[in-house]
Amino acid sequence: MCPQTSGREKAFLKKLPLATYRDIVSQLAELGCKEINLQGSGEPLLNRNINEYIKYAFDKGIDCNIVSNGFNLDETMSEKLVQAGLKNIRVSVIGYNTTQYAHWMSKDAFSTVYRQVHRFMQISKSSYTTISSYHLILDNDRIEHEIVEYRENWIDPLGIDAEIWQMHNWGGQYDTPYERDKKEKRSCGRPFAPYLNVRAGGIDGKHAAVVPCCYVLGQDSKAVLGHLEDQSIEEVWNSVEYNALRQAHKEERFDDIDYCKNCDQLYDAPDSLVWSNIKGKAYGQHKIDKSFDFRDFIKND
């Protein structure tokens, strides 16, 4: 459904084996990790036993969040997610009415997803699990109009926590309908942050490839820093590849990194968050942890 799906590489369109996942989560627990996101490089609810993944992490003291298009959020799946201890599901809804949604999400499912989100809100009420929604501005000349449409057609009637953003360019792979202020180019901070991005697939037939960030989606093979299928987290974190990426960011040699050189995350764009009713939500924060800003980890020394 997502317009980004067509650009994904076949080697990365896999399901992460549960045994491999458990090994990774066990390492994370030993390292003191408290929270993970489980969407990786695809739609998490295509994995019909995603609840087993969530429950394993929950039992290790690690909260799980997912980002989903919500199309597979049926009643059974909703109950399984809540019972497993999911912390938050963020539903991606691109398009403020049935017509726009069908165009941008490539499926006429606006009403279906709306009903399923409403039901999930009832099922998860008074539980540990929360739900929110994420939306994009489609025409930058009509920002205020689109905010009103999203609110009237989705956010306000559901009473859901939501955020509306301008589009980003997926590591330079797509043209966006607006230009960021390009006066100050700087590191995004991600190579230095206590943050690990693991894909389900990998190169050479492997699973659990580590890549620098979510924005390399569609060009992951260029950005592999190691594989947790046959390496430990510590080995990948301290690898030659990871340290070379950090050094390039320290020296601001972004043009030397093919998957970084045209990425719009190298520029500040505080106006890209155009509206939110989430308390304390601000530009630069992590999707879930509002205390976590990647720019705080930028190192130029």
Where are these regions (language model features)?
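Flexible mid-to-C-terminal extensions adjoining Fe-S/redox cofactors in radical SAM and related proteins
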Residues: 5, 210, 215-301
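Radical SAM/AdoMet-radical enzyme domain recognition
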Residues: 2-145, 151, 155, 161, ...
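Active-site and channel-lining beta-strand-loop segments
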Residues: 193-217
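A conserved catalytic-core signature of glycosyltransferases
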Residues: 40, 191-193, 223, 232
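Flexible glycine/acidic-rich beta-alpha junction loops that bind and position SAM and/or redox cofactors
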Residues: 137-143, 161-179, 216-220
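Short, well-ordered beta-to-alpha junction loops that form the rim of enzyme active sites
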Residues: 136-138, 167, 201, 214-216, ...
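Structured beta-strand/loop patches that form or line metal/cofactor-binding pockets in enzymes
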Residues: 168-196
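Short, compositionally biased leader-like segments
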Residues: 149-175, 286-301
